[in-house]
Amino acid sequence: RDLRLAIIEGDSLIDEILKEHGHPGQDMGERLKSIHPTEIDILNDLWEAHKIRNRLAHEADFHLSVEEAKKIIGIYHKTIEELLNIELELI
C-alpha cells in the first residue's frame, strides 16, 4: 500500500515539475508528449511508469510486485534528479 502511494505521489511530483518547466498540456500524459527525447534520458521508462501509475489509480484489482514498484520509484527518482539537476538520496 505504501509503495502504491509512493508511485502515485512520485508521478504527481514529476507532473508539477514539468508544469514549472513550462511543458504544456492538460495532464501529465500531454506534458510527457511535449518532452523532447534529449531532455530526459529515460523518457520511455517514465512513460511506462506513468502508465502503471494510471492502472494503480484506476484499476482496483491491479497487482504490482514489490520489485516492479521499487523499479518505478527508481525511475521517478532518476527523473527528478535529471529535471532538477540535483542528486537525491533514496531512502
Place the predicted regions along the sequence by residue.
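Amphipathic alpha-helical interface elements
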Residues: 1-42, 67, 75, 79-91
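Histidine-centered, metal-coordinating catalytic motifs and their short helical/loop contexts
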Residues: 39-63
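Short, exposed beta-strand-loop hairpins at the edges of beta-sheets
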Residues: 59, 68-71
